[in-house]
A protein has these predicted regions:
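Inter-motif core of Ras-like GTPase G domains
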Residues: 2-18
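A short helix->loop->beta-strand "cap" motif at the edges of active sites that frequently abuts
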Residues: 11, 68, 223-225
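Internal gly/pro-rich beta-alpha loop/helix module
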Residues: 24-134
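Residues that mark the start of a beta-strand
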Residues: 148-150, 252
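Phosphate-binding active sites in nucleotide-utilizing proteins
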Residues: 150-154, 158-202
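Cysteine-nucleophile active-site neighborhood
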Residues: 200-275
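C-terminal hydrophobic structural anchor segments
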Residues: 265-304
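Conserved small/polar residues in nucleotide/adenosyl-binding loops
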Residues: 321-330
Length: 331
């Protein structure tokens, strides 16, 4: 958690507290955060969704009585609202994020004591821990490949869960070319294809129509091409994707002998520990979709929560799926 990281690094924490539908009664909450774990240094509070200056006066009084510095607030502003959907915030090209950030910055400058905030952050807090950059701490050293690779990355409204750090790592391996499965780009010539996560279920109809690209991906895989697919990217590699609304199944690339469905979807979330061939792997699970595999395909590993409880999410080791033609894969 962010609190654990703050404790390990011995850095101050500024809490952003929603003041919606609360006033002075927020005092016990603030007091609890301050005293629950003394190793986590709560340095100040910024309130969000404050309705008026008089509302803020009650909140500031709560901070005084709880013994925590009040740094300011953000007023309730319609223009700062970002709608959410099942995997997070709705960020689209239709809305300028720069405009939203500029508006937020203007409000922060007006209602938050930035001098006090910066003073808190600039203090010297010696860190008691050091993490050597080695495989012994779970962080392996990274050496760029001598051979420069050609890397193709899907990036469009359906595939956009991309971490900047991953792009930096891939850039060290070679040159990057972006393409769009949704808008019908051709598959670039590549040594590695990266299909990141996103919302393919919202664009299943458009993806289903990209026969040329799907056939190119399939041929690439059959000829030994390397594909890194995460979450939504893996959904694109299945035989079909069934949409939540209407229950229509759309044919995908068919590279994996699996089907994916959003019907009856529920949240799968949490830290995971996997036992596989004598190895223990750790990671994080976060998805709503379900994979449907042939009965003859068993899960190859057991998966456990951080508390040691076994979870039902299967893990498959798939051979490349082949069928005579794309028509046979259409459902």
């Amino acid at each position: 958690s962010s609190a654990e990281i703050a404790r390990l690094l011995n850095i101050p924490v500024v809490l952003i507290v929603s003041a919606r539908s609360t006033a002075y009664s927020v005092a016990p909450l603030i007091y609890g955060f301050k005293h629950f774990n003394p190793a986590v240094k709560i340095a100040g509070i910024v309130f969000n969704q404050v309705s008026s200056p008089s509302h803020f006066a009650y909140l500031r009084e709560a901070c005084v009585d709880a013994g925590v510095e009040c740094l300011g607030y953000l007023p309730m502003t319609e223009g700062l609202k970002i709608p959410s959907r099942h995997l997070g915030l709705t960020l689209t090209a239709k809305r300028s994020m720069n405009t939203l950030i500029e508006q937020a910055a203007e409000l922060v400058g007006k209602y938050v004591d930035l001098d006090k905030l910066l003073s808190i952050c600039h203090r010297n807090f010696p860190c008691r821990y050091t993490l050597p950059y080695s495989s012994e701490t779970g962080v392996e050293s990274f050496t760029p490949s001598a051979k420069k690779m050609k890397i193709a990355i899907a990036r469009d409204p359906a595939f956009n869960f991309i971490y900047r750090e991953n792009i930096d790592r891939l850039s060290a391996l070679g040159s990057i070319t972006y393409f769009s499965p949704v808008y019908g780009s051709d598959l670039p010539d590549a040594d590695l294809v990266y299909l990141p996560g996103g919302y393919p279920e919202l664009f299943a109809r458009q993806l289903h129509r990209r026969k040329k690209l799907m056939e190119a991906l399939r041929t690439y895989a059959e000829e030994g091409g390397k594909i890194l697919a995460e979450c939504g990217g893996m959904m694109f590699l299945t035989r079909s994707l069934t949409a939540r609304q209407g229950g229509t199944a759309y044919a995908m690339t068919g590279i994996l002998p699996l089907d994916c469905t959003m019907v009856g979807a529920r949240l799968h979330l949490g830290y995971r520990r996997i036992e596989y061939k004598g190895m223990e792997l750790r990671g994080h699970e976060f998805h709503y979709s379900n994979v449907v595999a042939p009965d003859a395909m068993p899960s190859v590993a057991k998966q456990f929560t951080a508390r040691g409880m076994e979870v039902s999410t299967p893990l498959y080791s798939c051979l490349l799926y082949t069928s005579p033609s794309p028509r046979d894969r259409t459902r």
